[in-house]
Amino acid sequence: MADTWEAAHSAIKTGIIAYPTEAVFGLGCDPRNEVAVQRLLSLKQRPAEKGLILIAADYSQLLPYVEDSAIAQDKRFSVLSHWPGPVTLILPVRKGVSTLLTGGRDTIAVRVTAHEPARALCRELGHALVSTSANLTGQEPARTAAEVRQQFGDSVDWIMDESTGGAANPTRIINPLNNQVFRDDA
């Protein structure tokens, strides 16, 4: 596994990686690297206005992006009780976070994943990852490493060859502060 992690560390510095999530393969990069984020958006043919999701091994990896102090104490349990798990939350964004991640909004989409391969990857890298489905906009997302290779070829710098979590649908997306549902899991 050490060789695998070494390859992941090398690829994430400037590149795009693919890894399994709860339902589909995700494409990701270091959210602190704007060049890599722009490359990812270009590869996916995804408009920057849509924003991106960040996944993490634990909530502390999301603190550089989430304005934690803006989450009221009476909402804190509601927010944190969703994780780890297959729920992406829309939370207040910390000042200075790239608009490429937020789509220009004052919120950011984040998830503490329970899917162990993705969680182990975030743990090993020591930070959150951008996470967007591994597909060209408008096409079906890849569900295997082979499908990622088929859709993207050499455009992806490293692929984690593990299984998805087997969920039928992508994660639910909600704003727990106002109970707005952006994507249901049904």
PLM region descriptions:
Residues M1-A186:
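Active-site-adjacent structural elements in enzyme catalytic cores
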